[in-house]
Amino acid sequence: AAVAGNTYTWSPAFGLDNANIAQPVVSSPGTYTLTVTNSINGCTATDQIVISQNITAPAANAGPNKTLTCANPSLQIGTAAIAGNTYTWSPTAGMSNPNIAQPTITIPTTYTVTVKNSANGCISTDAVTISQNITPPTANAGADKTLTCTNTSFTIGAPGNASNTYSWSPATGLDDATLAQPIVSAPNTYTLTVTNITNGCKTTDQVLISRNITPPTANAGADKTLTCTNTSHVIGTTAVVGNSYAWTPATGLD
């Protein structure tokens, strides 16, 4: 505090709000010399003060941009914490803890981290963009089909895509349960699971494979005898619609 009867002079004056008062406000680093003069006897005294500066900003690193997927529905962002810094993230929606260096997020957006150096109050900011890829693949197990005596196996499914993997269940009755279009030879309900390699998203579809191997009825009729009076006979039984008939040998038949 100023003493009555004394005058005050600070040097240099640069960086001071008033170089001629006892307690000026300083805003620049440097070595300041104070000269105090007694107005009555003209005696002087001097003293110095060193004003240093610490305005080093902390490092703010929100980390690289990332993508949420079905395989990775949550991600950690940011980088390792530095002692003496505080961390504040925004927005906070979808975030595990907005006041740590490396929170976990579940929502796609652009997140900004503000890092404050507790020692000097300096702050820095950085941002990271989180996108999302949860587009499911297409699963097509194909149309329901029926195994028969003439069609004992056939292909199911649809043409595959190199960006997907394929898995059929059950595997029994299939030549390869990891193909997009396996060959089936046994009746069952087959479930196809298609997984997108890039995002891990899955889609399923089913196909019903039935079997019809019921044989038709073959009835050649009762044994008969050709005679002089019965030189020909009708053999067999009445035809059934949908059946075809073949006799061997053909010699002697109309």
Feature annotation, model-predicted:
Residues 1-254:
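Proline- and Ser/Thr-rich low-complexity, intrinsically disordered segments
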